[in-house]
Swiss-Prot record:
Gene, per the UniProt record: helD
Protein's UniProt name: DNA helicase IV
Keyword Isomerase: yes
InterPro entries in alphabetical order: DExx_box_DNA_helicase_dom_sf, DNA_helicase_UvrD-like_C, DNA_helicase_UvrD/REP, Helicase_IV_N, P-loop_NTPase, UvrD-like_ATP-bd
EC number(s) stated in the UniProt entry for this protein: 5.6.2.4
Any one GO MF annotation of this record: 3'-5' DNA helicase activity
Residue positions binding ATP: 216-223, 503
Span of domain UvrD-like helicase ATP-binding: 195-505
A biological-process GO annotation: recombinational repair
Coiled-coil region(s): none
Amino acid sequence: MELKATTLGKRLAQHPYDRAVILNAGIKVSGDRHEYLIPFNQLLAIHCKRGLVWGELEFVLPDEKVVRLHGTEWGETQRFYHHLDAHWRRWSGEMSEIASGVLRQQLDLIATRTGENKWLTREQTSGVQQQIRQALSALPLPVNRLEEFDNCREAWRKCQAWLKDIESARLQHNQAYTEAMLTEYADFFRQVESSPLNPAQARAVVNGEHSLLVLAGAGSGKTSVLVARAGWLLARGEASPEQILLLAFGRKAAEEMDERIRERLHTEDITARTFHALALHIIQQGSKKVPIVSKLENDTAARHELFIAEWRKQCSEKKAQAKGWRQWLTEEMQWSVPEGNFWDDEKLQRRLASRLDRWVSLMRMHGGAQAEMIASAPEEIRDLFSKRIKLMAPLLKAWKGALKAENAVDFSGLIHQAIVILEKGRFISPWKHILVDEFQDISPQRAALLAALRKQNSQTTLFAVGDDWQAIYRFSGAQMSLTTAFHENFGEGERCDLDTTYRFNSRIGEVANRFIQQNPGQLKKPLNSLTNGDKKAVTLLDESQLDALLDKLSGYAKPEERILILARYHHMRPASLEKAATRWPKLQIDFMTIHASKGQQADYVIIVGLQEGSDGFPAAARESIMEEALLPPVEDFPDAEERRLMYVALTRARHRVWALFNKENPSPFVEILKNLDVPVARKP
């Protein structure tokens, strides 16, 4: 059927289209120079209008586009419109049945996801959204018309809800799932550890996101959560023991975790590993070789001897090396270097040995060629760093030669080899769930190992437990931003905060939390105490009062109560401790550096050495170009890592903390603590 404009209407309308023809499933409008085909699957509405003389047809298309036919005789226009409209609606009714079937399939998919007694991840909801969008793009009708049809309307609205407010639907589902799990497994959460898990701990355990960061403040029971998570995966049948990988940062921590798992889960099938042990396993399985870790890794004296011998050789045999080293040590390090053959000076050798060891270690950790190291350095120090690398290159070569002679590898080499084996597909990861302790200590190299494992199976979950407030190992390569920007580095997921500490009282918590959160770069989180503490729970005291303080403690501290004396450095050990065994024989006193105290706790803590200067706390920045180029960037906030070290010291105590300061030359931290209403006592 065809509709044409009248001769006069055509002339007066001056419009590109003057005729229309109904097709099988569409309509064609045309003129002398133009033609436009409108398929029914793009047609939203047809309007028939009457002007002063002639009729007008209006075809509404997506994106607010309208095609018009003017100048037609009104009676013919009406007849054509009724015929076209009936044809279009018959076609639309047939197509709505197809659309209805597709929409019902999407509802079935949604029901499958939400009906399962499982956590709904962001990744899964994104997948459902993508599938719905793909299905809608394949519908025979424009989605704008779905509201018109009774057989499509309800299903379309449900699909729209998933497209528009998916996060709300996901949260609602997961909240219901979590409550159901906490009820169904109430006995498990009561018994899995020596004390029942609190709600925040239990919620972290059942969270099923593929990338989950559990922020565990000091004393909040992170080990309990890790053990419970492993037990939960077994209890739910979500993993077999061999599909769970539990990672710790040190051998001692791994052994303690193993013991806890045996004791609480009654299984020896889950074994905690260090990153180095994991790398060793991957290399053994992926290359059928059994690498030997160099004896030098555990022999500091032998390493120092190796590096000093090579350094002396280079300086004595090559004038350029001797000149370069003299310049480095005097200009950058500002050391006093003897005239003449300075490399033979034993005092200088002793001082330099640990530095050479550290710098070679940083180069090994980087793992790249010299050109790559130089290219990755900040531009403003790149030229100078290039000179330093050339001076260090022979020492790195000597290290590699020593490894070759021993037919061994070093720790950094282990992880690099493991990553290569994973990337080449020579080892297929059996682990569905990776649980990592002390995640704030992770380095880029270890993060790359985790990424290589997860790349093999996109469904592998990462359950990372850590505390950015206790990130104190940048000097060994740890990069705090891997925790603070967790999801940027490890993929979409969630964060859970363990909000209760079982260690210290509310006053210690208040001071420590406010102190650390003055740095806006630290993640904000709640950390509440179960016990109250008075204002004296944290006290500033002159360092001359240490003996008097220990005298007072000897009067009321119980024999089983531990007193921990902490300092920034080993050599800050108070002289008073030499007489402790006889003067305070009933006191259980331990001394350690703050770094060594990580993971420890005591009833009473005494922090010594709060002074300014070369041996001060906070420690002055003493990084060379090597550290600046090869370690993660220093944070903008002043003394950020030293502040975290102070937080660690404060939070070792259950009952009381005394911060002993130098009255003549106090640490900047003293003034900060005063501003947090920490009292200054004249005597204990």
